[in-house]
A protein has these predicted regions:
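Transition-metal
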Residues: 1-145, 205-233, 257
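Short beta-strand segments in beta-sandwich/barrel cores
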Residues: 267-268, 284-289, 302
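Short acidic-glycine-tyrosine-enriched beta hairpin
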Residues: 163-175, 291-308
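Ligand-binding loop in jelly-roll beta-barrel domains
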Residues: 86-88, 96-101, 110, 131-134, ...
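An exposed, glycine/acidic-rich loop-and-rim segment of catalytic or binding clefts
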Residues: 156-162, 173-175, 180-232
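His/acidic/aromatic-lined binding-pocket segments of jelly-roll/cupin-type domains
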Residues: 93, 102, 124-127, 165-166, ...
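C-terminal amphipathic alpha-helical segment
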Residues: 201-273
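Short, structured beta-strand/loop micro-motifs enriched in basic residues and often containing a Trp
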Residues: 152-159, 283-287
Length: 328
């Protein structure tokens, strides 16, 4: 029998990151393998230098994402994307468990990031997987604010008074363009989809200290130039989830994200799309069937569908919830 060396849906080994604010939900809910009780992030799919995801299934197991792009180029990521980004995988996918408040922070846009750090900027979105009853996020300012007001509040330890706190529950979606001040608060679990960048300007960190008694570095000056000081109106993305249909969530220059809720087989045809597709499975499990491949996907797994695959069947075992992400 002829060996099939064509591309197929790829699963990856999660890259688990200990954080000062991390917890145990990622191992409890999503079976992430770790002895640590401080896992804040699982980098599900990353081409970020030094943190490249490694394939865990099929004949390509053991190869990392950058090596695959080098070999398969546009067949893996899409011709247009390969032309623009080369060997850089343009997006980063994470699961984040805030067992304590994250620092209040902001990310630079592409232009500033390129100039200062030779990096992509960071526009991102959050899908709230779960939240404790009092779970909230910080998203921008309550009212329009001047640089002077902001600096004074920072100096007087009352920045919190200026910021917009948004109560959240399971299923809420927040879009965070570069420049928007934000933070995940204690008790919130999110899926994060972002540009492939690890640039964070930390504005305030509650005077927390690390194991050596040192406070983490703040980036007050760097942040000042990139902050959007306008009031945040309605930070939540409005959407009506439909079963056995595609529900659009976010569409921006960097990524398009849809919600798929299904309890019967659905067929997704990507023949007109010049992009890879990523599935983040948040609830249930299902089989991806395409060409000569059948791949089981469990809750908490992330899968890369290569751009060369035009059509996939998603066969659920009960109810399934997943995020579908690509670049248009």
């Amino acid at each position: 029998m002829k060996e099939d060396n064509s591309l197929y849906p790829l699963k990856f080994q999660p890259i688990l990151k200990e954080k000062i604010w991390g917890g145990t939900k990622l191992k409890k809910l999503f079976n992430k393998q770790t002895d640590s009780d401080k896992i804040g992030e699982s980098w599900e799919l990353s081409g970020f230098k030094g943190d490249e995801s490694v394939v865990s299934n099929g004949f390509l197991a053991g190869n990392n994402l950058t090596e695959l792009i080098e070999i398969y180029m546009g067949d893996l990521v899409g011709d247009k994307i390969f032309e623009e980004f080369g060997l850089t995988f343009p997006l980063l996918f994470k699961l984040i468990d805030a067992n304590d408040d994250l620092s209040i922070q902001v990310h630079p846009d592409d232009e500033t990031a390129a100039l200062r750090h030779n990096s992509l900027g960071k526009t991102e979105m959050w899908y709230v997987i779960d939240a404790e009853p009092d779970g909230e996020l910080i998203v921008g300012f309550k009212n329009d604010c001047s640089r002077e007001e902001y600096l004074k509040a920072l100096e007087e330890e009352r920045l919190s008074d200026l910021l917009k706190k948004v109560p959240v529950r399971k299923g809420d979606v927040i879009f965070i363009p570069a420049g928007l001040v934000h933070a995940i608060k204690k008790g919130v679990l999110v899926a994060e989809i972002q540009e492939s960048s690890d640039l964070t300007y930390r504005i305030y960190d509650y005077k927390r200290t690390d194991e050596h008694g040192k406070e983490r570095e703040l980036h007050t000056e760097l942040a000042l130039d990139v902050i959007n000081f306008s009031a945040t109106k309605n930070p939540k993305v409005a959407y009506e989830p439909k079963v056995n249909a595609v529900t659009p969530l976010v569409s921006c220059d960097y990524f398009t994200t849809n919600l798929l809720l299904f309890n019967r087989t659905i067929i997704r045809n990507y023949s007109s799309l010049d992009s890879f597709v990523v599935y983040m499975c948040l609830e249930g499990n299902f089989i991806i069937e395409c060409e000569n491949h059948k791949i089981l996907v469990e809750k908490g797994e992330t899968v890369l569908i290569p751009a060369s695959l035009d059509e996939v069947s998603l066969i659920p075992n009960g109810e399934v919830k997943l995020l579908e992400v690509f670049i248009q």
